[in-house]
């Protein structure tokens, strides 16, 4: 008799994706983040579902309903802080996952990569709308500033913004629709994850050498299931430490004040995981130019496969490209820091320099360095 996991239509899919999947024998811990992202998504959907049972998406009661969750609901504070800090863990894993893809040339699987970029946009949109829901000061003003950016689009901008707002300012209609979309998007993300995995399993995983590993594969279970469990335990340990000891470390104190349209906070800034893009937006004096730079800072990932000029796929044996990669990583940290600073003298010029460097490394320096390395390899 055939094993049920190999014959049952549903079990067969799970078996071919998680158990008998052939995986390269040499993939490192940088390949753990895919599974961690899946677990983060499941955690966010689960905690979000329970939070939605107690939350009210009305401007008069939203802030109080979040307070009610924290004070009166059994373990409501755990749910709320798991959800808020879970988003931070999600983005840490997401950025490391993208960084891994850039370093090891995983973007050469273009379909998987492009679906991944769409996923990144979807997760960013979901996180932005989620930040608006507690209806604190930073929620309200963050929503006002970011949605207002669409008014920079010529001709249709103003109408587009009012259409998104559902009125002439960020108000009750905006909050209600943001809640609806914030609830819906994670399920769309789940479907996109399936597509992402479908494309990945068409080609198989890349590995640190960047060389095809068809001749040396091992089953996913038990080798990589055990490895993923270790990564999961480490992530949960970090997340629980954050939630139980310092839940507000990554948040903004202004969001503990109810939204007040008559009082603008001195420094409007998004959550830490958007600060690098926010810094790029602010570094361009022109509104439309800033919006374009903001969108391109993420959309540029789509053209990465076209900019690959090296004869080698991975950066493992390309020290010059490695230097540029880590310069890019440092530059993104600098942009994140700048995004959280006020718009005044030293920070403006640093932000502009870091923004120019960001685009220069990706569009000009990386492809040129790869060509130089190709030439050096001939010697």
From Swiss-Prot:
Gene3D superfamilies assigned: Cytochrome Bc1 Complex, Chain C
Check the record and name the CDD domains matching this protein. Answer: cytochrome_b_C, Cytochrome_b_N
Keyword annotations for this protein, in alphabetical order, are: Electron transport, Heme, Iron, Membrane, Metal-binding, Mitochondrion, Mitochondrion inner membrane, Respiratory chain, Transmembrane, Transmembrane helix, Transport, Ubiquinone
Top-level division of the source organism's lineage: Eukaryota
What this protein needs as a cofactor is:
heme b
In terms of one coarse class, where is the protein primarily found? Answer: mitochondrion
Q: How does it sit in the membrane?
A: Multi-pass membrane protein
Q: Name one GO biological process term.
A: mitochondrial electron transport, ubiquinol to cytochrome c
How the cofactor binds, per note? Answer: Binds 2 heme b groups non-covalently.
PROSITE patterns from the xrefs?
Answer: CYTB_CTER, CYTB_NTER
Q: Which GO terms describe its cellular component?
A: mitochondrial inner membrane; respiratory chain complex III
Query: Where in the cell is the protein located?
Result: Mitochondrion inner membrane
Q: Where are the transmembrane segments?
A: 33-53, 77-98, 113-133, 178-198, 226-246, 288-308, 320-340, 347-367
The cross-references to InterPro entries, in alphabetical order and at most eight, read: Cyt_b/b6_C, Cyt_b/b6_C_sf, Cyt_b/b6_N, Cytb/b6-like_sf, Cytochrome_b, Cytochrome_b_C_euk/bac, Cytochrome_b_N_euk/bac, Di-haem_cyt_TM
Disulfide bridge partners, by residue number: none
Q: Which residues bind heme b b562?
A: 83, 182
Query: What family does the Swiss-Prot or TrEMBL record give for this protein?
Result: Belongs to the cytochrome b family.
Function (record text): Component of the ubiquinol-cytochrome c reductase complex (complex III or cytochrome b-c1 complex) that is part of the mitochondrial respiratory chain. The b-c1 complex mediates electron transfer from ubiquinol to cytochrome c. Contributes to the generation of a proton gradient across the mitochondrial membrane that is then used for ATP synthesis.
Extra information: Heme 1 (or BL or b562) is low-potential and absorbs at about 562 nm, and heme 2 (or BH or b566) is high-potential and absorbs at about 566 nm.
Task: Indicate what this protein is called per its UniProt record.
Answer: Cytochrome b
UniProt source species: Myotis capaccinii (Long-fingered bat)
Q: What is the lineage of its organism?
A: Eukaryota, Metazoa, Chordata, Craniata, Vertebrata
């Amino acid at each position: 008799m055939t094993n049920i996991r190999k014959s049952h239509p549903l079990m067969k899919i799970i078996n071919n994706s998680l158990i008998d999947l052939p995986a390269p024998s040499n993939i490192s811990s940088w390949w753990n983040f895919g599974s961690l992202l899946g677990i983060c998504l499941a955690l966010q959907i689960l905690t979000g579902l329970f939070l939605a049972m107690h939350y009210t998406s009305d401007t008069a009661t939203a802030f109080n309903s979040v307070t009610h969750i924290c004070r009166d609901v059994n373990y409501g504070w755990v749910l709320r802080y798991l959800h808020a800090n879970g988003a931070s863990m999600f983005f840490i894993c997401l950025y490391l996952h993208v960084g891994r893809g850039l370093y090891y040339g995983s973007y050469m699987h273009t379909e998987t990569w492009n679906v991944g970029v769409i996923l990144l946009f979807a997760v960013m949109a979901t996180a932005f709308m989620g930040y608006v829901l507690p209806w604190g000061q930073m929620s309200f003003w963050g929503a006002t500033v970011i949605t207002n950016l669409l008014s920079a689009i010529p001709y249709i901008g103003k109408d587009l913004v009012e259409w998104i707002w559902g009125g002439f300012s960020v108000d009750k209609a905006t909050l209600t629709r943001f809640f609806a979309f914030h609830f819906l998007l994670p399920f769309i993300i789940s479907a996109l994850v399936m597509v992402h995995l479908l494309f990945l399993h068409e080609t198989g995983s890349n590995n640190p050498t960047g060389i095809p590993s068809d001749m040396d594969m091992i089953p996913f279970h038990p080798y990589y299931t055990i490895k993923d469990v270790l990564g999961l335990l480490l992530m949960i340990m970090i997340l629980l430490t954050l939630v139980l000891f310092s839940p507000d470390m990554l948040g903004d104190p202004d969001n503990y004040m109810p939204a007040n349209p008559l009082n603008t906070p001195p420094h409007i800034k998004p959550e830490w995981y958007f600060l690098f893009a926010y810094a790029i937006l602010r570094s361009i004096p022109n509104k439309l130019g800033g919006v374009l730079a903001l969108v391109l800072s993420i959309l540029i990932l789509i053209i990465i496969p076209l900019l690959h000029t090296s004869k080698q796929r991975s950066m493992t044996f390309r020290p010059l490209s490695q230097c540029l990669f880590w310069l890019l990583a440092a530059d993104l940290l600098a942009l994140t820091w700048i995004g959280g600073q006020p718009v005044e003298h030293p920070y403006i010029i640093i932000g502009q320099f870091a923004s120019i460097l960001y685009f220069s490394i990706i569009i000009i320096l990386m492809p040129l360095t790869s060509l130089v390395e190709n030439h050096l390899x001939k010697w």
